[in-house]
Amino acid sequence: MISAGVDSKDLAKRGESLIRQSTNRYLTTVKIAFRAKQRRFDDFDGLLEESSVKPVHRAIVELSDEQDQPDLLPG
């Protein structure tokens, strides 16, 4: 999913896309922060192997992927 290094330009484009396609910028920012917090605690619990990527970067990539490819979501 996420390589060891996340390209900063790609990350910026993904973040801009999330904000641009949202109806509420504040809620999108809160969603990113909440997801990053979850990932940080998952790192502490040892549930995630990819600790080289910052949680906020991982959150932006995950939310962007969910937005762009909704067929990846379970259910």
From Swiss-Prot:
Signal peptide per UniProt: none
Keyword Iron: no
Keyword Transferase: yes
An example molecular function term from Gene Ontology annotations: DNA binding
GO CC terms of this entry: DNA-directed RNA polymerase complex
Entry's EC annotation: 2.7.7.6
A Pfam match: RNA_pol_Rpb6
Superkingdom of origin organism: Bacteria
Keywords annotated in UniProt: DNA-directed RNA polymerase, Nucleotidyltransferase, Transcription, Transferase
GO biological process, one term: DNA-templated transcription
Catalysis: reaction(s): RNA(n) + a ribonucleoside 5'-triphosphate = RNA(n+1) + diphosphate
NCBIfam families with a match to the protein in the record: PRK00392.2-5
Summary of the function given for this chain in its UniProt record: Promotes RNA polymerase assembly. Latches the N- and C-terminal regions of the beta' subunit thereby facilitating its interaction with the beta and alpha subunits.
UniProt similarity note: Belongs to the RNA polymerase subunit omega family.
Subunit structure and binding partners: In cyanobacteria the RNAP catalytic core is composed of 2 alpha, 1 beta, 1 beta', 1 gamma and 1 omega subunit. When a sigma factor is associated with the core the holoenzyme is formed, which can initiate transcription.
Name of the molecule in the record: DNA-directed RNA polymerase subunit omega
Organism: Synechococcus sp. (strain CC9311)
